Amino acid sequence: PDGGPPNNWAAAFSPEPSWTLDQRSGQYYLHLFLAQQPDLDWNNPRVVAAMHAVLEFWIERGVDGFRADVVHCIGKDPELADMPEDLVGLPAMLQDFGPGTHDQQRAIRRLLDDKGSMVVGETYVLDTTTMASYLEGGDQLHLAFNFPALHCPWEAARWRVEIEGAN
């Protein structure tokens, strides 16, 4: 409304905002990473259908597994609310994007299960409970990278806390 970016989200790996003005359209587009990597609008049914078609294309050619990058960022806050003040400047991709993301993961899982394929997700969230939320119920990711474990000191007591936190 004021002619600037829709919110204060920051891009990862860069001091730049996660919004870039497209000169031709006069509109901003979202990229949680590089400006050359625009985010897809997973709220758009045509985008979802196209992405499912991509999966089916590769499955028909014998691919039986996929690695999904930054899957915790698929769904976005429909309000595009600002990051809280205490998180301003941190990459927006560090937030958990919530229900829309989990709904999309369930739809992808159904498609892959029907075809006998699987998906491992890169979920760069920094707590085990949030990471585990992408696995619970057996209807989202088949496997997920455990990034919280990468940041855990190599001490038995800390690992116990990390593992028990994934209940």
Feature map (PLM): residue ranges:
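Acidic/aromatic-lined carbohydrate-recognition and catalytic surfaces
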Residues: 1-56, 60, 72-126
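Conserved alpha/beta catalytic core and glycan-binding cleft of carbohydrate-active enzymes
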Residues: 1-9, 105-167
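Hydrophobic residues within beta-strands of alpha/beta enzymes
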Residues: 66-68
